[in-house]
Amino acid sequence: HKALFQHPAGGFDDIFSYFKAFQKFQFAFVAKKELGEIPLYGKWIARIRSVFIERDDPRASLEAINRGIEYIKEGFSLAIFPEGTRSKGPDPGEFQKGALKLATKPGVPIIPVSLNGSYKMFEEPGHLTSANIEMIVHKPIPTEGLSRKEEKALPDIVEKIIVDGVRKLQANEQGVDHE
């Protein structure tokens, strides 16, 4: 199974959540370069074939994206956090539109994932606390053979699916019937 999994970034533990939820998939992750510099964690995510994006260096970012596409062609799924940074609260940040090129170029499906609760693990800087993490894995969105118009509309469609899912999880957490 090859796919691009996309969800809002809540915390450093999101990668662990993915491994638990998607044990049948071989994953590589797209992460900002700074995550690769965290002791132990950085070495671990580098070893599992993560692709590190340097936001200040467009050429290096393009090379990283091409490396991610190669990983997909080799049979890995790729998980990307479309905001490009960790959320410091319950609401997803602004999505980076270019993130979906990793799926549209090789023509693999996008699997939107809504995640709630992981941001709570790092509410206090420097302290790791337990948190209930809930996840909705949405239906795959095919990308093979999309027209330019469909490809251009894709980021907004994926963002809406993810954000609506996060809101549903938040409503459930608060005991509100969202449906």
Task: Label each residue range with its predicted role.
Residues H1-P8, D164-L169:
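Alpha-helical membrane-embedding segments
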Residues K2-L4, S50, G75-F81:
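Residue-level preference for the first positions of well-ordered beta-strands
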Residues A3-P58:
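Catalytic core of membrane glycerolipid acyltransferases/transacylases, capturing the structured
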Residues L62-E179:
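Non-catalytic C-terminal accessory region of glycerolipid acyltransferases
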